[in-house]
Amino acid sequence: MLNGLDEGIRVQVSTTVSGAESPKLVLESVQNIFPDFTAGVLVEPKFGTSNNYQWENEQISLNNFNQMIHKQANLDTALYVMGMKLRNDKTSFQLLRQASIAQKIAFNLDAGNPLGGVINVELTGDNLADWLEAATWHKGRDTVPKRINDERKMDFDGEPSTWI
């Protein structure tokens, strides 16, 4: 299984803990997808106080993330979302923490900050498009080939642009 690090991909994962959010639950939601992710001291908010943390880790393995998108069979969605902002061998995307706390992968396609927050992921590396296609490959692509930004890509609102 491709993990990004062994293939020369720079992986940066970050999230924000704010307001009355529980740092423990936020960390759990991130670690459900990225088990190597670490955070500093976890101080639960008390009534009348709020949290404001920005957590960021670099060189995080994508192995568990890749296993999850394969198991949950959302490889084409993953390819399209991860490829939407691909420019000059760099891309970024967001995962919904509300889904990750339940050990599911769901991508944030909205520009705002949804209920439960997001996990920000940035990938940088030579031939990143090829790596994304390899990491999300499945047998169905033998019959219906797909590539980043092909005519079958989904629109920015998540709707399919064509049906087969």
Locate each region found by the language model:
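Short, charge-patterned binding micro-sites
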Residues: 40-63
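Long, hydrophobic N-terminal alpha-helical segment
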Residues: 1-41, 45
